[in-house]
Amino acid sequence: MKYTATDKTAKEKTKSKNIKTRVKPGYHLSLGIVVTMLSVIVLIPLASVLVYSLKISPGDFVALIMKENVRNAFITSITSSFIAAIVNVVFGLIVAWTLVKYDFPGKWLLDGLIELPFALPTAVAGITLSKLYSGTGFFGKGLGKLGIDVAYTQAGIVVALVFVGIPFVIRAVQPVLEKMDNTYEEAAYMLGATPSKTFFKVILPELRPALLTGFGLAFARGIGEYGSVIYISGNSARHRTQVVSYVIMQKLSYIDYASATAIALVMLVISFLLLLFVNIVQVKQSQRTNLL
């Protein structure tokens, strides 16, 4: 029986695959640990939110979400998170660009300070921001003379969400800028393109997936933020400065777990759909970029 070159190649690939499988010991154990940890840390808690929220009938669920204070809290959280995410994308890109493209004294310190919102307790951030932007604060006093109130308004919520969300954008964009090939940028300059045209036509398309990722993470973080917001927002239903996380804490303080988990479920679905949309757009954008 004769063997063709194709048969020989197939046998070599099968042999190589078998060897590769054998040199990876502990596969089933590792997979079991990963699945168990994900289940305990992520899946079971998320499933419990769904289970508790099902204790409310569909009619009561809709009535709860449509209550004026709950509805306004969702509107405030979503709009504030969206505005803050847009601001974070703009300023996060500028900071990441500065850190990657330029050398200056204290660069290492600035790069390290970016991680501060991650490490700083959110309650401490909220107290600090509320003091700075209050009527007697360092920033609030000057803004007050211009007739601009930040503390205990929706603007204060946006400021807090910008503070906690900007590291997501910077850390998403910075590695892409560091690995970006400068050949296309230099070619654009040689062909007579202006710096602004080079940025928008050559550089920005490469950064778009990272910017979308940073936007999605900052937005999702903003919707669920609690500690840094409650101290600067005022938490007033009449002035529409309550956020969803504060309403959930109110329900929990009243031992109303079903209502709290129902509201949390809606917030969870919104965040999941947003991140899913961002990931889909990111994948399509990456595929389109690779085809160019």
Q: What are the language-model segments listed below?
A:
Residues K20, P58-M66, R71, G106-K107, ...:
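Membrane-interfacial helix termini and adjacent extracytoplasmic/periplasmic loops
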Residues K20-K24, H28, V49-I86, K101-Y102, ...:
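Periplasmic/extracellular loop-to-transmembrane helix junction in inner-membrane transport proteins
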Residues V40, I75, T79-F91, V95, ...:
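Hydrophobic alpha-helical transmembrane segments of multipass integral membrane proteins
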Residues G32-T36, L116, F163-G165, V169-D181, ...:
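Transmembrane alpha-helices
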Residues N18-R22, I83-I114, I127, K131, ...:
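Transmembrane-helix boundary motif in ABC transporter permease subunits
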Residues I148-Y189, F215, L276, I280:
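Membrane-cytosol interface at the C-terminal ends of specific transmembrane alpha-helices
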Residues R22-G26, F61, E68, Y226-N279:
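Interhelical loop and adjacent transmembrane-helix boundary motif
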